[in-house]
Amino acid sequence: MRRPNCSWRPGTACLCAIILVVTPGMASAWWDSGHRLVALVAWSRMDVPTRTRVLGLLGEHPQVEKYFTPPARLQDGRLRHQWIISQAAVWSDLVRKSDRDRPTWHYINRPLFLSEKARRSLQPRLRVNLATRLPKGASLATQDLNVIQAISLCRQRLNARDATEAERAVCVTWLCHLVGDVHQPCHSTASFTARRFLRGDRGGNDVPIRGDKKDINLHMYWDGQFGQTRTLDGDLVRRAAALLADRKLVAAGRRAEKRLQGETWVAESHRLARDVVYSSAILAAIGSGESDPEKAIPAVELSGDYARRARAVARQRVVEAGFRLARVLAEVR
């Protein structure tokens, strides 16, 4: 792909223009809507040289023809560039169950226990990867990294002297996705119990939540905070512009971009998981399942207050992720 001409001023106005030409997409979940929002926020924060370098690298991606060729309906160069960066943010989900898939890269299961007694009993027996340092010889082919390690690897390889342009492009796509992942609290934490969740609740995937039409799970609830849009549609772009118009959120983003360590981002998400995601009602439901691990945990009906807090947390985390992603991609040389 030819390096694009990015000689235009960064800002939020360009987000609004795309509304006129992008049609609504099919249903999906957070990892489309949320990740594309992170990418759009990041794009608004990048300077022109960074945009040029990032788009140039994505033009060298080994799957550029399949995943990074904008739809013909997008004629405006600026809109095509936005589509490409938002596509980079979902590429790692598009290649799931292929040889490029790295399932463990998306999360880390920092433990949450029902009590101090449970922590003392269970922690020595945990079999989870909580490492923050890369194993010796780690590469983009290494399967069993956690999200902290994966981010560290991609940042290292992004400017490694022996890295090919194709490898660096893959690093960009992973970073566009993983920076979003690590800001979703359920990607940082799992609840561990002595009987039912000895191996963890998979970031809330095994905790049922009462839904309007059918029950979902805790992880899905948080994944769904930004709706079910598979592609870049007008509503999604309007929401990105609204996030960037919120002074409090922008202030939070500016504070966040000063802290660029993946371990710090996980620690923030873990605190949110502990303080917001795993509410007293959810912990009580998990605890009730310990008496009979074979019996289904009762679905938790979340309160209006919980929903409001979740919405506020999700909005802030997406903005923080976008600001940080812009700073990380500024490392591209």
Give the predicted meaning of each segment.
Residues 1-15:
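Bacterial N-terminal signal peptides that target proteins for export
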Residues 18-22:
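Short hydrophobic transmembrane-like helices used for membrane targeting/insertion
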Residues 28-178, 185-333:
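N-terminal, motif-rich segments that launch catalysis or mediate targeting to/interaction with membranes
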Residues 24-26:
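N-terminal signal peptide c-region/cleavage motif recognized by signal peptidases
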